[in-house]
């Protein structure tokens, strides 16, 4: 996957990603219309399919709402790169098939607007803007399969032949 980067700081909470006042639905398109609205009001209008969110420490902290990664996926975010993730956001992202990558160095050095490509199979991030390459700890194959399937439910249905 390849996209333009959107840079955020530390401690971006699930409330920053999708505010509680929009939780009356779990429909990805409806949530996408308000994704990151409190942090960047025009984000959902400016983001393009495949773009990548880059953030600092503790991305997705706060409440355990699954709506946050659903909103990001609804915006067609290609992946999130962060120094670290709140564990519940990390798990929810895998469950809905949103690729997430922990890389302190990449999160620190990638700039807003950089053109970045991620190869999940090779555990590599290539910043086409700076020419730098970063590696990250690969997921176990089953987790990669869940993400590739589009989330846990789709993965299970596929495994069951449904």
What are the functions of these language-model segments?
Residues 9, 56, 129:
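Pocket-edge structural micro-motifs
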Residues 16-122:
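Feature captures the catalytic cores and cofactor-binding loops of soluble hydro-lyases/lyases
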Residues 1-19, 154-162:
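N-terminal, positively charged, Ser/Thr/Ala/Gly-biased leader segments
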Residues 96-162:
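Acidic, glycine-rich flexible loop/linker segments
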Residues 12, 60-66, 147-157:
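Conserved phosphate/anionic-ligand binding catalytic regions in large, soluble enzymes, centered on
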């Amino acid at each position: 996957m390849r996209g333009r980067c959107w840079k955020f700081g530390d401690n971006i909470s699930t409330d920053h990603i999708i505010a509680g006042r929009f939780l009356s639905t779990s429909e990805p398109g409806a949530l996408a219309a308000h994704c990151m609205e409190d942090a960047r009001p025009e984000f959902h209008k400016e983001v393009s399919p495949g773009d990548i969110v880059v953030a600092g420490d503790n991305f997705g902290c706060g409440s355990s709402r699954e709506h946050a990664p659903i909103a990001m996926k609804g915006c067609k975010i290609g992946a999130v790169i962060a120094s670290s993730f709140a564990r519940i956001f990390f798990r929810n992202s895998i469950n809905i098939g949103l690729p997430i990558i922990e890389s302190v160095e990449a999160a620190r050095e990638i700039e807003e607007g950089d053109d970045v490509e991620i190869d999940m199979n090779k555990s590599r991030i290539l910043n086409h803007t700076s020419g730098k390459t970063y590696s990250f700890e690969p997921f176990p194959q089953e987790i990669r399969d869940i993400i590739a399937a589009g989330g846990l439910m789709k993965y299970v249905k596929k495994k069951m032949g449904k």
